Amino acid sequence: MKFLDQAKIYVRSGDGGDGVIAFRREKYIEFGGPDGGDGGRGGDIIFRAVPGLNTLIDFRYTQHFKARKGGNGAGSNRTGAAAANVTINVPVGTQIFDEDRETLLADLDAEGKEVLLCRGGDGGLGNTHFKSSTNRAPRRADKGWPGEERWVWLRLKLIADIGLVGLPNAGKSTLLSVASRARPKIADYPFTTLHPQLGVVRLNNTEEFVIADIPGLIEGASEGAGLGDRFLGHVERCATLLHLIDGTESQIVKHWRLIRKELEAYDPELAAKPEIIVLNKCDSLTPTQRSAKKRALAKASGAEVMMLSGATQEGLPELLRLLQDRVTAAKRDRQG
């Protein structure tokens, strides 16, 4: 399935049905009074977050959503039928912005969460409402009220517990594939991952977490280089960042600082999230290189550095256990 994390769509709720002009027509009643019914309500436009979706690709092909008009009133004071609502299903984590792309209208960050974006128009009044002591046979009825319309932007920010970040070719896709059921494309060249990937890591029957792998970041990502500003949005909701660094590179400290700089430039709150630093591809390093690089990275970051080999899975069980503990603790804190 193709991945799409932004889409512009048009939505319009239904107009209200028209009220009608009608009079009683009964045997032996020559001058029946007014009995025109009201129009029915127009359909609403509702957005709902549902599980099982992780892309906005459907909105590339369907971009206009319109609810129906309410039914017109009828004689005998019959009200027109209300039109059915139009419910638009979107992935959990979808944000809805106004056409200016800045005004946030709704954040559907939980399964089942809904927002009524365009309310259907009210039905018009039938002539029964206009009867008075001086006007016993009113020939007036109201048209239904118009519905609401607008263009909106949808932006998907994936919901994951762990955000996997790093430069291109750091081994993120390999780690995701061995740690979860995800099967991302893997090759030994930069930018193998072209869009965010989600994987579920299940340690046992009761413990699991979701990890998001975003395409490798490059310098200037926070300003849009390589679409980095869009990709970074997918780790904003993560509780912990897993920063993967290619241990075979000569300038590992520089690479760590580059990613930290981009996180800070994009959003200081994102940079302030807890970070686990992992030196990957350690199977390609000698014991002396391992020790020296781990020490240099720990000194620069002021944090513990874990050693990992995605290829041989060295250090993987320890890393997954640490990630699960972080996720469990974060959920416990949120629950108060």
Swiss-Prot record:
Residues covered by the OBG-type G domain: 160-328
Main location: cytoplasm
Keywords for this protein: Cytoplasm, GTP-binding, Hydrolase, Magnesium, Metal-binding, Nucleotide-binding
Gene3D superfamilies in UniProt: GTP1/OBG domain, P-loop containing nucleotide triphosphate hydrolases
GO biological process: ribosome biogenesis
PANTHER family reported for this sequence: DEVELOPMENTALLY REGULATED GTP-BINDING PROTEIN-RELATED, MITOCHONDRIAL RIBOSOME-ASSOCIATED GTPASE 2
InterPro entries: G_OBG, GTP-bd, GTP-bd_Obg/CgtA, GTP1-OBG_CS, GTP1_OBG_dom, GTP1_OBG_dom_sf, OBG_GTPase, P-loop_NTPase
GO cellular component: cytoplasm
EC id: 3.6.5.-
Top-level lineage group: Bacteria
Identification of the protein by name: GTPase Obg
Residue sites binding Mg(2+) per the record: S173, T193
Protein's job: An essential GTPase which binds GTP, GDP and possibly (p)ppGpp with moderate affinity, with high nucleotide exchange rates and a fairly low GTP hydrolysis rate. Plays a role in control of the cell cycle, stress response, ribosome biogenesis and in those bacteria that undergo differentiation, in morphogenesis control.
Annotated Pfam families: GTP1_OBG (PF01018), MMR_HSR1 (PF01926)
Keyword check for Metal-binding: yes
Keyword Metal-binding: yes
Residues that hold GTP according to the record: 166-173, 191-195, 213-216, 280-283, 309-311
Needed cofactors: Mg(2+)
A GO term for molecular function: GTPase activity
Family membership noted in the UniProt record: Belongs to the TRAFAC class OBG-HflX-like GTPase superfamily. OBG GTPase family.
Occurrences of domain Obg (ranges): 1-159
